[in-house]
Structure formats: structure tokens, C-alpha cells
């Protein structure tokens, strides 16, 4: 979830 910069801080990586 992004902090409000408009872009997520890190790429979406599903936890397996």
C-alpha cells in the first residue's frame, strides 16, 4: 500500500 506518493513504495510481490 502506497503512503500517498501516488506510487507504491515497493513492487507488488505475493507472499507464498
From Swiss-Prot:
One of its GO terms (biological process) is neuropeptide signaling pathway. The modification Pyrrolidone carboxylic acid is found at residue 1. The keyword Protease does not apply. The modification Leucine amide is found at residue 16. GO terms for cellular component: extracellular region. InterPro entries: Pyrokinin_CS. It is found in: Secreted. Keywords: Amidation, Neuropeptide, Pyrrolidone carboxylic acid, Secreted. Signal peptide: none annotated. One of its GO terms (molecular function) is neuropeptide hormone activity. Mediates visceral muscle contractile activity (myotropic activity). Belongs to the pyrokinin family. This is Locustapyrokinin-1. It comes from Locusta migratoria (Migratory locust).
Amino acid at each position: 500500500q502506497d503512503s500517498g506518493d501516488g506510487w507504491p513504495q515497493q513492487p507488488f510481490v505475493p507472499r507464498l
